[in-house]
Regions:
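N-terminal secretory targeting modules
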Residues: 2-89, 135-138, 236, 242
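Substrate-gating cap/lid alpha-helix
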Residues: 15-22, 40, 175-206
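Conserved SGNH/GDSL esterase-like catalytic core that processes O-acyl groups on lipids
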Residues: 83-156, 177-184
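Loop/turn elements at helix/coil->beta-strand transitions in domains of secreted/extracellular proteins
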Residues: 87-88, 110-112, 137-142, 165-171, ...
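Solvent-exposed, polar/charged alpha-helical surfaces in well-ordered, non-transmembrane soluble domains
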Residues: 91, 99, 103, 107, ...
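Conserved beta-strand termini and adjacent loop/short-helix elements that scaffold enzyme active sites
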Residues: 93, 115-117, 173, 203-208
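Internal catalytic-core helix/loop-beta-alpha segment
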Residues: 150-153, 161-162, 170-172
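Catalytic His-Asp segment of secreted/periplasmic serine-dependent ester chemistry enzymes
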Residues: 187-242
Length: 242
């Protein structure tokens, strides 16, 4: 009888172990399959967007539409104290977050010049804007969409703003990621730089992003198709109402 009980208990243990292994395999599939799928789709999107932006970079910059001769956003702002985005040439310096949203933003501002790359950091931005300026592609309105990939100090940010000058309207989109370690430090630095410069305005993506987890891919940083469109509209809304 004892042997039968032992056999029964061993059978239960074996069955329980098998169920545990199956449960672990199912959980592992759920954890790893979705992010891999997301990563593949995101990679394809970013590569496609980079190719499209590279084509545009090879062509001369278009002047902003419906802009009266001799009128720029800078002169309008100086006269009224309010940036006029409708009469502005827009340039964007961004990382992979903005690269993903580039097509959606171009639908809102088709003449915007976007220079966005994967893994880009703020410390690289000064050389980028100098190159854009040399090519005549640095607009009256500049959007800085950097900070996700690493911290920087106020001096680095100020050098960038100094080069862009006081006559440009500058929007700096702050950083957000569901588990982004540098977010707090980066955003504090962005706000310090903005506070020191009247023409720099912060677009608080870090406050809007957390409200919409369904806009993001699995990594909680990059945006899916829906999120890209919403992000572009959020940026536009903040540029208009700033």
């Amino acid at each position: 009888m004892k042997k039968k009980n032992n056999h029964f208990m061993n059978t239960l243990k074996s069955f329980g172990s098998a169920l545990l292994v199956i449960a672990i395999l199912i959980a592992a599939y759920g954890i790893y399959h979705a992010p891999t799928s997301d990563a593949s789709q995101l990679k394809a999107e970013l590569e496609q967007n980079e190719r499209e932006l590279a084509k545009e970079e090879a062509t001369p910059a278009n002047p902003p539409e419906n802009t009266p001769a001799g009128t720029t956003a800078a002169t309008h702002s100086a006269a009224t104290g309010v940036p006029d985005i409708s009469q502005s040439s827009i340039s964007v310096i961004g990382d992979s977050v903005f690269l993903g949203a580039a097509p959606a933003f171009k639908k809102l501002y088709k003449n915007a010049v976007i220079d966005a790359k994967v893994s880009r950091q703020v410390v690289q931005a000064l050389d980028i804007v100098k190159n854009m300026d040399k090519k005549g592609k640095l607009g009256d309105t500049v959007i800085i969409a950097l900070g996700t990939n690493g911290n920087f100090n106020s001096a680095t940010g100020q050098k960038l703003i100094d080069y862009l000058g006081p006559d440009r309207t500058i929007y700096w989109i702050d950083a957000y990621g569901r588990n982004l370690p540098v977010q707090r430090d980066v955003n504090n630095t962005i706000r310090r730089v903005a506070k020191a410069n009247n023409n720099v305005h912060v677009i608080a993506w870090s406050k809007e992003g957390p409200k919409h987890p369904d806009w993001f891919y699995q990594d909680g940083i990059h945006l899916n198709i829906t999120g890209q469109k919403k992000f572009a509209k959020f940026v536009r809304k903040n540029m208009i109402t700033e």
